[in-house]
Amino acid sequence: MVDHLANTEINSQRIAAVESCFGASGQPLALPGRVLLGEGVLTKECRKKAKPRIFFLFNDILVYGSIVLNKRKYRSQHIIPLEEVTLELLPETLQAKNRWMIKTAKKSFVVSAASATERQEWISHIEECVRRQLRATGRPPSTEHAAPWIPDKATDICMRCTQTRFSALTRRHHCRKCGFVVCAECSRQRFLLPRLSPKPVRVCSLCYRELAAQQRQEEAEEQGAGSPGQPAHLARPICGASSGDDDDSDEDKEGSRDGDWPSSVEFYASGVAWSAFHS
């Protein structure tokens, strides 16, 4: 699946085309041995609503971004190392089909494909690349995953106090630990979660109490064992109001429809959704 494409001219051209579409805002993607295996538009469930996003599957990373002009210009590039990825198949509902969750320690989110066949293609290709990466790096599969954010539209009231009703003046916030939609009063605290951010992040009141209790227990065990504790400025949870940490960098403009693609690639299409896998 990978070896015969590595270091070929066609693979280099494909990767260069991706770099060109992201332009100066994106990171360089060409590396010796890196292969572009698949690409396509999937629907990503963002904070406010589901939006089309461009995805590129390499043998060692998964790249996605916002669509400015389909197959011409992308932005908000995100790069996920595949050894950190775990997939979870989601059940079908009348309103939501062909969905699965991409889980990592830093961020987890839900995507959907245009058909069950396309979803299975993406899942099988990603899982095979993850297996190869884990074998190559000798790392065990990832077991810690960030909670996905519950979409804003899922609730009109705070999911913690169940009293505050959201409006144009009463905004929604998200707990970085559990992903719940909460009001400002129920998410006044911050806590340092190193796997998510080097800075303390907003958490809801329940998660704050649980995290603080867990931290106190760990500190007591360390003191009982006679081991030096973590420096206070790193170990202590940070309290206070949060205001500027709720932005979702994926909340960008939607893209246009597709143009023409070579007939030699395996292709799925429905509306703005499409996927192609190289072999």
Curated annotation (Swiss-Prot):
Protein name: Pleckstrin homology domain-containing family F member 1
Renumbered zinc finger spans (FYVE-type): 152-212
Record GO terms (molecular function): phosphatidylinositol binding; phosphatidylinositol-3-phosphate binding; phosphatidylinositol-4-phosphate binding; phosphatidylinositol-5-phosphate binding; zinc ion binding
Residues annotated to bind Zn(2+) 1: 158, 161, 183, 186
Job description of the protein: May induce apoptosis through the lysosomal-mitochondrial pathway. Translocates to the lysosome initiating the permeabilization of lysosomal membrane (LMP) and resulting in the release of CTSD and CTSL to the cytoplasm. Triggers the caspase-independent apoptosis by altering mitochondrial membrane permeabilization (MMP) resulting in the release of PDCD8.
Keywords: Apoptosis, Cytoplasm, Lysosome, Metal-binding, Nucleus, Zinc, Zinc-finger
Compartments where located: Nucleus; Cytoplasm, Perinuclear region; Lysosome
Chain spans, region Disordered: 218-264
A Pfam family it matches: FYVE
Positions with biased composition (Acidic residues): 244-253
The species this protein was found in: Homo sapiens (Human)
Domains: entry comment: PH and FYVE-type zinc finger domains are required for lysosomal location.
Tissue: Highly expressed in heart and skeletal muscle. Weakly expressed in brain, thymus, spleen, kidney, liver, small intestine, placenta and lung.
This protein's GO CC annotations: early endosome; endosome membrane; lysosomal membrane; lysosome; nucleus; perinuclear region of cytoplasm
